[in-house]
Amino acid sequence: MDKIVTRFAPSPTGYLHIGGLRTALFNYLYARANGGKFLLRIEDTDLARNSMEATKAIIESFEWAGLDYDGEVVYQSQRFDLYKTYIQQLLESKKAYYCYMSKEELDALRKEQEKNKQTPRYDNRYRDFTGIPPQGIQPVVRIKAPLEGNIEFEDGIKGQISINAKEIDDFIIARSDGTPTYNFVVAVDDALMGITDVIRGDDHLSNTPKQIIIYNALGFALPRFFHVPMILNSQGKKLSKRDGAMGVMDYAKMGYLPEAILNFLVRLGWSYGDKEIFSLEEMLELFNPNELNSSPSAYNEDKLLWLNQHYIKYMDNTLLEQLLGHFGVTKLSESKREILYPALKDRSNTLVSFAQGFNEVMNAPCSYDEKMRIKLDANATQWLNELCKNLNMASWEDNPNIIESYLHQFALEHQIKIGKLMPTLRCALLGKSGGIGVCEALAVLGIEESMRRIYTFIGYQNNI
């Protein structure tokens, strides 16, 4: 097999969405697993709709996801002279020609064909034209498509594809202003960049026969094609922003980890037995584009959250703390971090929810859960006062297990049911039910902050 060269070629008319990142991932995995090259090309020929911000977001998304590409980014907008050279080559070899039909003539032809219940298409009137060109018309350039036979190719996912040549007219490869069209620049660039395998969404399937015509006209070897089915929502419809079709960096801002996103995406259309968790190294070892499913995949947000929680749970706490800094989480001493982080990991499926849980512990409550508060024992403040007296004298240790033993001993000595003492402390320290354990909270907050919160709660209770 030749050295594998793949590419990802987004248009910078919008942000890179989740489906685009999946396509990039499939190309990346196939190239890297086979010791090949993975290239990035920005298809920015639509000068009116291009956005530098979108281009930056695409590259930022790659950096965030950890998908490195080889060489420099190729920008199609910087290659117009190159494309014109190949258009001229086709004109000189009589494989393309100037078409002088006006917009009015094209509209009239289309209306006539629709009236006769024919498929609208160009009628090849200038295909073999040798006369004098009409005045005042800036011509387009059309390629000579086959008039008979079939255009065939083997798709790695969909199998053998055959299109009747009569379904494709002499399509435009250069507009009247001289700018090349999408299918032309894609075919030329894929050939010149040495792309051996084109893995892309099946919304590009209809472009493939036209690109093959261009390949053949220029004498370029065809790459292998893999057209990946789309990602659909749970109702089987095209993914919308409401379903999850957001920019990749939106997921970063929502607190998703790149490892979770890549794991989620690789399973949308590919599987390896019943295995669900894949590190990037495992993906590189196991992924094969020939095993991609031919049916669309469904976006499942619950599955993504489950994966994200898995990667948060098993992430090194030091690295996790660095990432959480982007979400307003302050650093803790190592001893306190090693108590609080494991307690929050089991309750957090995004970095945002982790940060929220962190702040709920580290920031004193502004209010108290009323339903929880009114259920407390009538002697609650008395217990808390007595506990603070004992805490003040106790040798405090930042160890939840030692604190738990101490609280049990305190409850036993004061004839308090531990099942009543713990909710009282939780309400005073955190202001609500749920969250991390009381002993973990006491250990992380330390004796001074814990006592301050307890006395604040006692004052609140006494003033009601």
From Swiss-Prot:
It holds the Pfam family tRNA-synt_1c. The keyword Cytoplasm applies. GO terms for biological process: glutamyl-tRNA aminoacylation. SUPFAM superfamilies: An anticodon-binding domain of class I aminoacyl-tRNA synthetases, Nucleotidylyl transferase. GO terms for molecular function: ATP binding; glutamate-tRNA ligase activity; tRNA binding; zinc ion binding. It catalyses: tRNA(Glu) + L-glutamate + ATP = L-glutamyl-tRNA(Glu) + AMP + diphosphate. Keywords: Aminoacyl-tRNA synthetase, ATP-binding, Cytoplasm, Ligase, Nucleotide-binding, Protein biosynthesis. A motif ('KMSKS' region) lies at residues 238-242. The keyword Cytoplasm applies. ATP binds at residue 241. It is found in: Cytoplasm. It is an enzyme of class 6 (ligase). Its EC number is 6.1.1.17. CDD domains: GluRS_core. A motif ('HIGH' region) lies at residues 10-20. GO terms for cellular component: cytosol. InterPro entries: aa-tRNA-synth_I_cd-bd, aa-tRNA-synth_I_codon-bd_sub2, aa-tRNA-synth_I_CS, aa_tRNA-synth_I_cd-bd_sf, Glu-tRNA-ligase_bac/mito, Glu/Gln-tRNA-synth, Glu/Gln-tRNA-synth_Ib_cat-dom, GluQ/Sye. Belongs to the class-I aminoacyl-tRNA synthetase family. Glutamate--tRNA ligase type 1 subfamily. NCBIfam families: gltX_bact (TIGR00464). Catalyzes the attachment of glutamate to tRNA(Glu) in a two-step reaction: glutamate is first activated by ATP to form Glu-AMP and then transferred to the acceptor end of tRNA(Glu). Monomer. This is Glutamate--tRNA ligase 1. It comes from Helicobacter hepaticus (strain ATCC 51449 / 3B1). The lineage of its organism: Bacteria, Pseudomonadati, Campylobacterota, Epsilonproteobacteria, Campylobacterales.
